[in-house]
Amino acid sequence: MGGGVGSRFWPYSRESKPKQFLDIFGTGRSLLQMTFDRFSKVIPKENFVIVTNATYRDLVLEQLPELQPSQLLLEPMRRNTAPCIGWATYHIQAKNPKANIIVTPADHLILQEDVFEEAIKQALAFVAQHPQLVTLGVRPSRPETGYGYIQITGETEGGFVQVKTFTEKPNLEMAKVFLESGEFLWNSGMFARNVQTILDAFHRYLPSLTSILDEVNGHYAQSEEQQHVGAIFSQCPNISIDYAVLEKADNVMVLPVDFGWADLGTWGSLYDLKKAEDKANVALHTEALFYEAEGNIISMDGEGDQLVVVQGINDCIISQSNGVLLICKRGEEQRIKEFMAEASLRFDKRYD
């Protein structure tokens, strides 16, 4: 899944080039390319399916020249993750009715890739033998308010644990309770399933989607697929896979994992990943000098050498990209979407 805007990373992530297409760490590979590299060790290249917004077709093909245009499913508009995954499932079933599928966002970071590879193989092997949905749950290391959580029961099967509930992003006090209880895992947003298992779940829990996608039966994995789905996609419900299916289904298992995972959804998550110690400053794509300043993250997007000097500022996001300079307290970063919306309204979308 690679069609989001990444608005919480504004102004570095923009409508024209969202964060999944950016080389955030200066490695020469974007988050999308790093995700592709990671899964290429497990999945044949010809079996990849990228669901993205139609606007990003050329960007995807430019960054992933290994893929054919037919491996891209181009959404004419954003309708959240349930329609995205639903369309991909119908497409894959038309090509292979017995396929086992792993779903992943395009913008996550994995530090221990060997451990990750084994977890993916384990999940795919499980769903090939069991009519269950398997999500990957990350063992929490801190009381994190930026992630959803999965509560587990004590019922296990070969390392897989029965899911009790899915919980949305908690406040700090509740996140501390979750951590101390030992009953909760971070929801990584990655899950595996057999194609028929997830189709059955969609038909049972989200018939408002399947009734629409069923109209295209006979055209999936054909040259006219894009045209037919594009004509009906606006009718699909705007809902996440978690709300639509996973929170309702009674056949969801979780594989607890620990492979150095991070959902790079916010400046705060990037700061936590890059900081050397508590209250340290972080500078990306620039040289920096700090005086009486701590807990800041700086990101400068520009050509050539750059230097930023910061004095007397604590716990801030300082980011410059494509004509926009953002200075915002890290504790207020949930307002970045608000800032972006106001800028779009006042300045005719020049800074989206």
Can you name each region flagged by the protein language model?
Residues R8-E15, G26-P105, L111-V115, K121:
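Conserved N-terminal catalytic core of the sugar/cofactor nucleotidyltransferase
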Residues L32, A88, D107, I150, ...:
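Residue-level signal for inorganic ion chemistry
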Residues E113-F233, M253, R330:
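Conserved core of the sugar-phosphate nucleotidyltransferase
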Residues I50, L73-L74, V103, V134-V138, ...:
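General beta-strand structural signal in soluble alpha/beta enzymes
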Residues M1-G2, V51, I102-P105, T135-R139, ...:
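Short beta-strand segments
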Residues V195-D352:
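Left-handed beta-helix
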